[in-house]
Amino acid sequence: MQENPTFNHQADLVNSAIRFINSWFRQSKTITAELSNFFILPGNKVIGAEVIVARLKGIFGQSDEYVGGRYDIIDVNFELMGEEKGMGFVEGVAGFRAVLKDQSKIISGPFKLYFALQNGSWKIVNIEFPGFAY
């Protein structure tokens, strides 16, 4: 049986996106496992992952919990630039209820997670996600 590298990369991207989204819904510290050491923002601005981690902690600290998290992945795409490098994305829609004491707020919308293939592993290099802002 012949191995299909396209399927493996697509599956890796989807699985990484799912781990990120599920960690988001749980407000889990394991979310950092999916992040690259650097992020590429519009205008070719590059920032370190520690800035993103601090931002995530600040966002998670605004709510006691997230409940009812749901998502649908609509598209996955990637381009390899040699065997060890590539760029890709996973996009879809996500929603959840942010609860703080007796108040709750529904947060939903489209998401797009941008990935770079680094040392054989897909890592997130940019985040567009409901409730997240740089």
Where in the sequence are the language-model features?
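Short beta-strand edge/turn micro-motifs at domain boundaries
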Residues: M1-Q2, K105-Y134
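Short, low-complexity N-terminal intrinsically disordered segments enriched in polar/charged residues
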Residues: M1-T30, F38
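A broad structural signal for short, well-ordered beta-strand segments within beta-sheet-rich domains
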Residues: H9-L13, Y66-R70, I124
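Extracytoplasmic/secreted envelope proteins and their assembly/folding machinery
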Residues: A17-I18, T32, V53, K57
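Short, hydrophobic secondary-structure boundary micro-motifs
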Residues: T32-E34, V125-N126
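A short gly/proline-enriched turn/hairpin at secondary-structure junctions
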Residues: E34-V51, E65
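Short, solvent-exposed loop/turn segments at secondary-structure boundaries
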Residues: N44, D102-S104
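Surface-exposed, charged secondary-structure patches
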Residues: A54-D102
